[in-house]
Amino acid sequence: MLKCVHFALGENTMGTFRMYTSDDGQSHFEDIDLSNTPDWTSAQATTGITFREIPVGNFQSWHPAPRRQYVIILSGQLEIGFGDGSKRVFGPGDARLVEDVTGQGHTTGVYGDQPCVTVTIPLANQ
């Protein structure tokens, strides 16, 4: 069963995740606990910000990330596939540090019947 983490007004939770390439060349994810990850809560140098609306039905086959970047979902949902065959659905408020810049990468597709709006924040010196 796919797990979907939601962020809604009035709730004090949001999903924070890291996507990375392990020694086997496959992409994986891990949940990030902000209280134990000070580098996530301190200022970081970035190179810009991009807002994107991804249409319903959009699917990208295996690809590594073009650079280390944060991707935050503002609305809609994305389903990300990983090298071990698992899939995870990310929704509004979920923030991902995408670091799987080598290896097979991951798949990305819009999940559900609404477009997905994301904000991408590339990290500097990556």
Please report, for each region that a protein language model flagged, where it lies by residue.
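Conserved short histidine dyad/triad with adjacent acidic residue
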Residues: 34-37, 48-65, 100-103
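Short beta-strand segments in beta-sandwich/barrel cores
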Residues: 38, 59-60, 77-81, 95, ...
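A short, N-terminal "cap"/entry segment at the start of jelly-roll beta-barrel domains
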Residues: 2-53
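Short, conserved beta-strand element in jelly-roll/cupin
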Residues: 65-80
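A short hydrophobic beta-strand segment most commonly corresponding to one strand
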Residues: 97-101, 107, 111-126
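Short acidic-glycine-tyrosine-enriched beta hairpin
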Residues: 84-99
